[in-house]
């Protein structure tokens, strides 16, 4: 019943994108194209002022795009030099436009508003990028790390260039998908931001590490291990991201009819309802595939370039917070990533908590707040 409406919307979105490509290509990245009010669901309680900006950025295959972000200002008069900026890289909400953080707000409302409200109360302005294709024309290349880094850096560049009350000094903070985005941002912030910005460091909680290793066995004979429905949703989002970034792979040809149907459903369903639907239908990951993904030539190399976290090249301090009861990411892999960074002489510190994936976010604040304060000191 919704297919004709969706098809029409996609057609209009594509036409809109094509009509605007010359403008996007001519606009320097990190430029505000428009600014307006945020929906109530996306407005952080306690913010003295909030806005939604559209800005120029980069998406898959270095194509120019328009992305969106929410900007939150703390109460009171800004200090000399402007409010220091926290770039908030949010966790997975879905890949459809209706799921965008600056449109629908967070999926974990109480958790995220408590977390961001704490940063706001410390005198930081917050710039929350949606990532390319979320809430704006085009597809969202889910977990494409370099694209996420571009989007986060360009959002900060756009906001600080547009609002004179914001400082050029900034740090990035992220959770889950956003922690991966924060780590990629940490690797490329100085390069992508250039002399216009003063990048100071990064915080990541629940960081998904070495996903490229975890995805290698996916295929029709994956054992029916009991997984969270949200984990199956993540797989579908990753497959959609690969389809967007590497159309030549013909990802659909590796899927069963049911797999292709779920891939299509995941394109528009946000995380929580998609997880509920997958759980209600008792979907098993192996049932999605008609042949192993490992048949893709150089699959591990391709995945590493797409979503593998960089193991060196960081020029500012990194804070990794990990819950020891976290089952949304593979905790031993995150701990291994921290150990690899330390062995490689990277400026990282690891903090662990007796919490799950979600609980670690606010539990980390007693450690991450002073860490970030020192970055701006």
PLM regions and their residue ranges:
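Short beta-strand element of the alpha/beta-hydrolase
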Residues: 68-71, 81-94, 98, 103
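Short alpha-helix in the alpha/beta-hydrolase fold that links the catalytic acid
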Residues: 185, 316-318, 330-340
């Amino acid at each position: 019943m919704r297919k004709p409406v969706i098809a029409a919307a996609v057609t209009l979105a594509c036409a809109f994108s094509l009509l605007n490509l010359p403008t996007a290509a001519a606009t320097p990245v990190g430029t505000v194209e428009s600014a307006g009010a945020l929906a109530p669901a996306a407005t952080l309680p306690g913010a003295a002022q909030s806005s939604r900006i559209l800005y120029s950025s980069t998406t898959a295959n270095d194509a120019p795009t328009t992305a969106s972000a929410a900007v939150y200002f703390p109460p009171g008069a800004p200090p000399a030099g402007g409010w220091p900026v926290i770039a908030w890289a949010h966790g997975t909400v879905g890949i459809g436009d209706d799921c965008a953080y600056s449109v629908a707000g967070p999926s974990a409302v109480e958790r995220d508003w408590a977390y961001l409200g704490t940063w706001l109360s410390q005198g930081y302005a917050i710039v929350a990028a949606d990532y390319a294709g979320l809430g704006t024309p085009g597809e969202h290349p889910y977990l494409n790390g370099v694209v996420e880094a571009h989007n986060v850096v360009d959002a900060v560049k756009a906001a600080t260039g547009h609002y004179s009350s914001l400082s050029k000094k900034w740090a990035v903070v992220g959770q889950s998908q956003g922690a991966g985005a924060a780590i990629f941002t940490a690797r490329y912030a100085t390069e992508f931001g250039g002399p216009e910005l003063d990048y100071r460091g990064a915080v990541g909680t629940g960081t998904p590490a070495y996903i490229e290793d975890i995805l290698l066995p996916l295929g029709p004979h994956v054992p029916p291990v009991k997984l969270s429905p949200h984990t199956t949703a993540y797989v579908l989002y990753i497959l959609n991201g690969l389809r967007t970034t590497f159309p030549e792979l013909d990802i659909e040809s590796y899927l069963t009819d049911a797999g292709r149907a779920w891939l299509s459903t995941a394109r528009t369903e946000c995380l929580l309802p998609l997880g509920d639907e997958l759980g209600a239908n008792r979907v098993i990951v192996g049932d999605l595939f008609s042949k192993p993904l490992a048949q893709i030539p150089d699959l591990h190399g391709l995945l590493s370039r797409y979503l593998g976290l960089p193991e060196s090249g960081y020029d500012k301090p990194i804070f990794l917070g990990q819950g020891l009861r976290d089952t949304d990411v593979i905790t031993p892999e995150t701990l291994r990533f921290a150990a690899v960074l330390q062995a490689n002489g990277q400026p990282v510190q690891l903090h662990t908590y007796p919490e799950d994936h979600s609980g670690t976010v606010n539990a980390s604040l007693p450690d991450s707040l002073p860490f970030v304060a020192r970055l701006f000191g």
